[in-house]
Amino acid sequence: RSLICSAEVNKAIHAGAQNKHIPSSKGYIEGRSYLFGDLEGAQALVERYAGTGTAVLTRKGDWANKEIILSDEVIGAAVDLETGKAEETKKFVIHYGKSGAHIVPAKEG
């Protein structure tokens, strides 16, 4: 958690990766889980929730550069890859990388 909150982890939104999950953007990929809002909204979610969720670990116990968050409000929709059905969700995963972070809405439960 302290690593996620530190300056070592890039928390700026990576526009290219995030736009794949914003339906109003040119980069949106049909069938992906999507975020309500825009890049600024995604950045606000990272700033608010970074370091507050559950870190995802590899089998070896190393941090997988991901964090699972359950927010107070609906942030987007998780799309079932098999059925294509979208369900509103408060759960999301922040993916952290050298080039920045992006958010992927996830199915609750």
What are these regions (language model features)?
Residues 1-109:
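Functional cores of ribonucleases/endoribonucleases
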